[in-house]
From Swiss-Prot:
LRR repeats lie at residues 742-762, 771-792, 799-819, 828-849, 856-876, 885-906, 913-933, 942-963, 970-991. Changing E802R: Abolished ability to activate the NLRP3 inflammasome. Residues 140-210 form the FISNA domain. Residues 131-134 are annotated as: Required for binding to phosphatidylinositol 4-phosphate (PtdIns4P). Belongs to the NLRP family. This is NACHT, LRR and PYD domains-containing protein 3. A motif (KFERQ-like motif 4) lies at residues 991-995. Predominantly expressed in macrophages. Also expressed in dendritic cells, B- and T-cells (at protein level). Expressed in LPS-treated granulocytes, but not in resting cells (at protein level). Expression in monocytes is very weak (at protein level). Expressed in stratified non-keratinizing squamous epithelium, including oral, esophageal and ectocervical mucosa and in the Hassall's corpuscles in the thymus. Also, detected in the stratified epithelium covering the bladder and ureter (transitional mucosa) (at protein level). Expressed in lung epithelial cells (at protein level). Changing M27E: Impaired ability to homooligomerize into ordered polymers. Complete loss of PYCARD/ASC filament nucleation. A motif (KFERQ-like motif 1) lies at residues 355-359.
Amino acid sequence: MKMASTRCKLARYLEDLEDVDLKKFKMHLEDYPPQKGCIPLPRGQTEKADHVDLATLMIDFNGEEKAWAMAVWIFAAINRRDLYEKAKRDEPKWGSDNARVSNPTVICQEDSIEEEWMGLLEYLSRISICKMKKDYRKKYRKYVRSRFQCIEDRNARLGESVSLNKRYTRLRLIKEHRSQQEREQELLAIGKTKTCESPVSPIKMELLFDPDDEHSEPVHTVVFQGAAGIGKTILARKMMLDWASGTLYQDRFDYLFYIHCREVSLVTQRSLGDLIMSCCPDPNPPIHKIVRKPSRILFLMDGFDELQGAFDEHIGPLCTDWQKAERGDILLSSLIRKKLLPEASLLITTRPVALEKLQHLLDHPRHVEILGFSEAKRKEYFFKYFSDEAQARAAFSLIQENEVLFTMCFIPLVCWIVCTGLKQQMESGKSLAQTSKTTTAVYVFFLSSLLQPRGGSQEHGLCAHLWGLCSLAADGIWNQKILFEESDLRNHGLQKADVSAFLRMNLFQKEVDCEKFYSFIHMTFQEFFAAMYYLLEEEKEGRTNVPGSRLKLPSRDVTVLLENYGKFEKGYLIFVVRFLFGLVNQERTSYLEKKLSCKISQQIRLELLKWIEVKAKAKKLQIQPSQLELFYCLYEMQEEDFVQRAMDYFPKIEINLSTRMDHMVSSFCIENCHRVESLSLGFLHNMPKEEEEEEKEGRHLDMVQCVLPSSSHAACSHGLVNSHLTSSFCRGLFSVLSTSQSLTELDLSDNSLGDPGMRVLCETLQHPGCNIRRLWLGRCGLSHECCFDISLVLSSNQKLVELDLSDNALGDFGIRLLCVGLKHLLCNLKKLWLVSCCLTSACCQDLASVLSTSHSLTRLYVGENALGDSGVAILCEKAKNPQCNLQKLGLVNSGLTSVCCSALSSVLSTNQNLTHLYLRGNTLGDKGIKLLCEGLLHPDCKLQVLELDNCNLTSHCCWDLSTLLTSSQSLRKLSLGNNDLGDLGVMMFCEVLKQQSCLLQNLGLSEMYFNYETKSALETLQEEKPELTVVFEPSW
């Protein structure tokens, strides 16, 4: 039988396989390519099968033809060419027509066996390469997991580490970036719509490289920006670990490579291949195969701000060959500028100080800002840090009581330092002193606990070592140097033995990957020691005479430091100066001298005060955030007498606040400011939605307890703009209003004050000590429910003269309640805005009664409401009353037609107080203007300003208006923009305006196409009558 014959032949071939080859044969049976149409044999059945059983299994599973094809293919795969060629020649003829229908890869004519053998080997080689790549990726992932699964605490003992997954606490990320210029423009235009319409967008780590929408391209470059200690590095390491663990970017990237920018910048010559090799677990990774698909590679470049060479746009020829050796900075610049492996993706971390420079190097990056910990995540971090739950709860409760310190803990580094200090205090049985309000205070406490002398000669040695650290830090800051060699340490009087001690205490961290290089554990610690360099009194024997050292130390003249502060290219000095202010606090100085047995100079206090005076009076300081930055310096000091003297130099304060820290800093400084004349605060709502939920508790907003203790003209002219205010915050803020003797203006526009907050404000406004005269509450989420409270204020507070309630849904019922207070004899309100308050004609009877009874109201703006002709007619009836003192009336976009113009005309002819009338956006038409002009031409009409923009006018009304212009003795401004007056109408105006009897000073026209004759007439008019201004307004 044929079946037996094929099985026997196949068994004989398998019998020729030695034990090793037979095992290989069975292995390939399990991994046989499925695209060849055969069923792989399960290991359980082949493992103990001999050659006969194996042949039978192969035929039973796949049939004779496919079983034979499998055997031939596997003979080639295990490199048994003899059996391959023999089986090819001995292959049975399948089917009645002798056609060979088995796999074409193994079926060919007799004379092409050699050719097929070579082709098959090439195919098997490709399979082997793919398998090898897959195997190497597996090996690389395992290495990355091993490398990044643990982190070392900065105060860890030798060999101690912490699981990254157990310690990591999720950070807030927002898809947000504003250039330096945009930030300045936003600060100068506080409260503008542009600012309000730019809410931040939270983004998850797994979506960083996803397109913005289905029509967009995927993102290839992501920039992580954030302040020092905000968590940029830990986030990058977490990304590496998650990818290697198979939970992140599995479908996007085959390889992630983590690059220390500061380490690479030290290398003189290195290729990208060398750089990739340094990231791999063995010396011979398949580099060629890795870079073959650059789109599947992600480079995580950590610390761009520490790569100084990358700032230089004229760095020289860039590298395009991944095998070519270049300087480290050129190599990274080539990657960033997409000259080297342009298809590869990049994730770059940087401090904001380097962001503007980085922006010029990138093409369409996605900017992501790290905001640190939310309140909930701060609590989570405490419970992860303390292994003992009771300790964690006690520590967190303690920090919650200190608002300032708790708020600072949004920065992960500060959170770690605070936890470390608390844990040390708990373990030693001591309680934490409640004096740590600033970063300086926290660092002083932390460092003093590590540097306590043991007495005797150690005290002298400690001072010498501390001086060495300070000079090393300052030298590094001025030379923008972060990594130091042992020779640098010797030049600053730090011997190798001294460094070992500091390593154990973690003032220095020895870099594992950069042998014989040392760095401060964090950039802020280097900045802290650099500040101390200007305060520590030098040892008598001096340090400038270190044997064999040619070291030239930076100048200790603090004026040199201060002169360079604030310069963009000297941005690295900002934190040094902040720490300097923090360290001259007298109590802090005494504490350090006692703890470290070192002398600290207080002589620079007057120089700092003088510098503040010069900066405060400089005109360029008006460009923010310079003023706020000076407040940060004063806040670090936490010495009220000094701060009060410094704040006397700020008669005008204009700052825009966008972070919690900004709130704290400004609040502290304003509380200590007694001579300010003008205050403008802008509070930007700059938090993702998850943070809004936390704000409902009102915790961080309570820090702004003060707006102004005593000022002669305190105008929060854009104060609290677009801020998320809560009732608890309002009580803290508004309590100041009842104690400030001269705070007269308060703007709370564009925030979520709401009716509850408004009730709190109204309580304060009724206080006898409240001197608010002007109050702006536009877009505050108010309704009719708060109108009774406002009415009580109007009937009791005789100081309030201006009130803006625009863009709040007060409704007709709310206005009825409001009018009760407006008609009260004690109400002195002069100006009232009710624009876009959801009003109808139903409220006009109440408003009209106010017009006829109020002795003070002179300006009423009720535009953007559906009052209609009937509603305006009711108002006009009372406005004709001789007792009506109304001077300005705004009826913009009120749904008016020519029907109401007779009523308006009668007011114009009888009310000599009315000087301004705003009617733009109403379809009055030419007929309406004709009626209006009857009143305007009356001798008793005193109107000075008339706005008729977008009133559906044509050239037909120009005769009536021309007659008005030659006759009116009062009209000075006429606005006719966005009306189709045509050339004929404008030419008519030109003739009239030339006349001496025309007293108009300002004419508004649409910016439209005029013929040559009309343009010439307008030009001639302005030449002949220079006192007349013609304004061309854009057509809507």
